[in-house]
């Protein structure tokens, strides 16, 4: 039963609605009238015993409403505005009153108001998901249309209530349902709502991209172009919308863009058309499949060319500088024209692999004669083999991507909604799944990752529950490889350069090693660069794992939160920090002669705390 709190309980009591960011597009004249009514604020009631039943319903004064109904008031009787009590209770999210009125014979789908809407329509306009759930559970029909011709899902889209959209579709509402004009929710979103959402959200439910409306024969892409909705156009093109379908006027989306003189959208459509046309050629398809390999070859050639120019037999550094600039210009053209945008994120990865390749070749060709048969030689070989193995394991191992079938997603959405948990803390609007504890959605991989640490651009993969331990050994082996090549460089200089640091001082020694072999100095600098960042990350990772029990994402999130808190937030006092030895045992999943036993947890399906349930709320906010 809802209490009669009178002040702030019903600030938004009328049957209007808010329009959250429609750009320049409105809905209708009636909508503005409803919106004006919604902004009215009822005066505070000091004595609720004398108020009428409409006002008592708006304020949620259950006892007063019950008293009047039991005295003979007909709950189906509309007021002067043709609005029923169920409408007023629905728009103000008075759950107990709705249950009471239904038990007293209220018509669940009674039409009323200026827009001839049902109580379900009113609840959706205001974004009251609990009320929507309650009305549907009592038999409300989501397919009914209001005076503007919109059904429930159309209204949820227009007012950008994503949880309600997800719930309606999961309960069986068709994502391709049309309004009186034959427009689907995707068409309305593309035309009425300027921005990427809810268009991107609807596309996750696999709506039809080729369906056309009754009047104009426009596809969703036509409507997005007509509205100048750049974000929606981008989403629809990414989803594979057709560029060739013509509307009733015989216009393609590109024709409409040219007619409206929207240069940005015209450029987007032309670029997409060119890319799709290129995919028809066998050579282009082959190049697309081999993009990463070609990028790796280009990177290896570029690194070799830089070293070759530096080692070129010329005393003119101006000439070498000009050659390096020309090389940089030429190599920048290949990724721009032949490598897709998605594969450009692998540039650091191919740079690392190319560096390791030339580090190995330098060791084998230049350093091998000075180290053959020594422990240094075998240590380097072991390090390079370990690096290749753990790089592959980090790359190939599933980091903990959370997966669910379409049916499982719908069941999860309904379950979360009906338990009051359908919010961004527990539900991923991109994957449409319930988020496990400590997970995060990676926008590069476009998937939720269990016990997410980071998306490492050096490996080109997410680091999570499945491959985090491989990542630690990857950093360790890379650090060892670079350490040995740095040591080998000093051995090479001591054997092949005519001077030493002790005899001639630093400046003369530096000049000599540059003149002795610019290539070795170049490889030394590459190794020093990779050694610096890999060692730093390794130390940072081991500190977080052993002393904090946190991932990189959790640590950064807690540090950000602490800036806005009055009291200092200790990173050590979290439910995941179980002490140095236990943290290491849990991370590497290994014990120590029975003294320490790891706690085996599958973070891909862990939704509640297992260590200290009282602290679950703290960690969910990380």
From Swiss-Prot:
- Quick one: a GO cellular component term? Golgi apparatus
Q: What superkingdom heads the lineage? A: Eukaryota
The protein's annotated catalytic reaction(s) are: L-cysteinyl-[protein] + hexadecanoyl-CoA = S-hexadecanoyl-L-cysteinyl-[protein] + CoA
Q: Transmembrane stretches, by residue range? A: 292-312, 321-341, 348-368, 372-392, 471-491, 519-539
- Which residues are modified to N-acetylmethionine? 1
Q: Where in the sequence is the active site?
A: 456 (s-palmitoyl cysteine intermediate)
Taken from the record's topology, the Lumenal segments are 313-320, 369-371, 492-518
Query: Per its record, what triggers expression of this gene product?
Result: Up-regulated by low extracellular Mg(2+).
InterPro entries given in the database record: Ankyrin_rpt, Ankyrin_rpt-contain_sf, Palmitoyltrfase_DHHC
Question: What keywords tag this UniProt record?
Answer: Acetylation, Acyltransferase, ANK repeat, Cytoplasmic vesicle, Golgi apparatus, Lipoprotein, Membrane, Palmitate, Repeat, Transferase, Transmembrane, Transmembrane helix
A single Gene Ontology MF term assigned here is: protein-cysteine S-palmitoyltransferase activity
List all topological domains (Cytoplasmic).
1-291, 342-347, 393-470, 540-622
Q: Does the keyword GTP-binding apply?
A: no
| Tissues with expression | Expressed in most adult tissues, but at low levels in the liver, skin, and lung.
EC number annotated for this UniProt entry? 2.3.1.225
> How does gene deletion manifest?
Knockdown of the expression in mice through ENU-induced stop codon in the gene or targeted knockout of the gene result is similar phenotypes. Mutant mice are normal at birth, but by postnatal day 7 appear smaller. They display generalized hypotrichosis and hair loss with altered skin that is loose with wrinkling and folding. Kyphosis and osteoporosisis are also observed. Finally, a generalized amyloid deposition results in early death.
Q: What membrane topology does the annotation report for this chain?
A: Multi-pass membrane protein
Q: Which residues form the DHHC domain?
A: 426-476
Q: Which residues form the ANK repeats? A: 43-78, 81-110, 115-144, 148-177, 181-211, 216-245, 249-277
Instruction: State the compartments where it is located.
Output: Golgi apparatus membrane; Cytoplasmic vesicle membrane
* Main function: Palmitoyltransferase that could catalyze the addition of palmitate onto various protein substrates. Palmitoyltransferase for HTT and GAD2. May play a role in Mg(2+) transport.
Domain free text = The DHHC domain is required for palmitoyltransferase activity.
Subunit field text = Interacts (via ANK repeats) with CLIP3. Interacts (via ANK repeats) with DNAJC5 (via C-terminus). Interacts (via ANK repeats) with HTT. Interacts (via ANK repeats) with MAP6. Interacts (via ANK repeats) with SNAP23. Interacts (via ANK repeats) with SNAP25. May interact (via ANK repeats) with SPRED2.
The protein depicted here goes by the name Palmitoyltransferase ZDHHC13
Name the species this protein comes from.
Answer: Mus musculus
């Amino acid at each position: 039963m809802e209490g009669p709190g009178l002040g702030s309980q019903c600030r938004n009591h009328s049957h209007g609605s808010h329009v959250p960011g429609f750009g320049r597009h409105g809905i209708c004249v009636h909508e503005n009238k409803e919106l004006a009514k919604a902004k009215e604020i009822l005066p505070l009631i000091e004595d609720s015993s004398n108020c009428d039943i409409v006002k008592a319903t708006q304020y949620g004064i259950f006892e007063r409403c019950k008293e009047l109904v039991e005295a003979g008031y007909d709950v189906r009787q509309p007021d002067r505005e043709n609005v029923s009590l169920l409408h007023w209770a629905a728009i103000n999210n008075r759950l107990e009153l709705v249950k009471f009125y239904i038990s007293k014979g209220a018509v669940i789908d009674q039409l009323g108001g200026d827009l001839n809407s049902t109580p379900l329509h009113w609840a959706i306009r205001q974004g009251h998901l609990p009320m929507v759930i309650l009305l549907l559970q009592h038999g409300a029909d989501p397919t009914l249309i209001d005076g503007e011709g919109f059904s429930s899902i159309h209204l949820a889209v227009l007012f950008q209530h994503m949880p309600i959209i997800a719930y309606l579709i999961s309960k069986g509402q068709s994502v391709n349902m049309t309004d009186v004009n034959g427009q689907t929710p995707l068409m309305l979103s593309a035309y009425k709502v300027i921005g990427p959402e809810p268009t991107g959200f609807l596309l996750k439910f696999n709506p039809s991209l080729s369906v056309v409306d009754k009047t104009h024969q426009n596809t969703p892409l036509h409507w997005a172009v007509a509205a100048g909705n750049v974000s929606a156009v981008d989403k629809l093109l990414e989803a594979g919308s057709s560029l060739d379908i013509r509307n009733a006027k015989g216009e393609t989306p590109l024709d409409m863009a040219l007619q409206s003189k929207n240069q940005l959208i015209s450029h987007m459509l032309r670029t997409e058309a060119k890319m799709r046309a290129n995919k028809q050629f066998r050579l282009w398809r082959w190049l697309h499949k081999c993009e990463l390999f070609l990028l790796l070859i280009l990177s290896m050639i570029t690194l070799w060319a830089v070293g070759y120019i530096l080692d070129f037999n010329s005393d003119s550094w101006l000439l070498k500088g000009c050659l390096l600039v020309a090389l940089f210009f030429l190599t920048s053209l290949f990724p721009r024209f032949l490598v897709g945008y998605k594969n450009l994120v692998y540039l650091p990865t191919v740079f690392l692999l190319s560096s390791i390749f030339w580090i190995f070749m330098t060791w084998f060709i230049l350093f091998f004669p000075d180290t053959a048969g020594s422990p240094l030689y075998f240590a380097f070989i072991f390090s390079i083999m370990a690096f290749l193995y753990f790089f592959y394991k980090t790359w190939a191992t599933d980091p903990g991507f959370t997966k669910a079938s379409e049916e499982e997603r719908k069941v999860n959405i309904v379950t979360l909604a009906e338990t009051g948990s359908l919010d961004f803390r527990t539900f991923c609007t991109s994957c449409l799944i319930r988020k496990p504890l400590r997970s995060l959605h990676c926008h590069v991989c476009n998937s939720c990752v269990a016990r997410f640490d980071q998306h490492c651009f050096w490996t080109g993969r997410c680091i999570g529950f499945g491959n985090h331990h491989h990542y630690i050994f990857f950093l360790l082996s890379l650090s060892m490889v670079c350490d040995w090549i740095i040591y080998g460089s000093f051995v090479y200089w001591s054997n092949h350069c005519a001077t030493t640091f002790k005899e001639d001082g630093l400046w003369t020694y530096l000049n000599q090693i540059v003149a002795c072999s610019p290539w070795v100095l170049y490889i030394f600098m590459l190794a020093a660069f990779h050694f610096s960042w890999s060692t730093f990350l390794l130390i940072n990772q081991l500190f977080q794992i052993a002393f904090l029990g946190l991932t990189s994402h959790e640590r950064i999130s807690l540090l950000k939160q602490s800036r806005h808190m009055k009291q200092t937030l200790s990173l050590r006092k979290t439910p995941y920090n179980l002490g140095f030895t236990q943290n290491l045992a849990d991370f590497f999943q290994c014990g120590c002669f029975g003294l320490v036993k790891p706690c085996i947890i599958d973070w891909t399906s862990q939704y509640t705390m297992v260590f200290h349930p009282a602290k679950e709320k703290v960690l969910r906010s990380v």
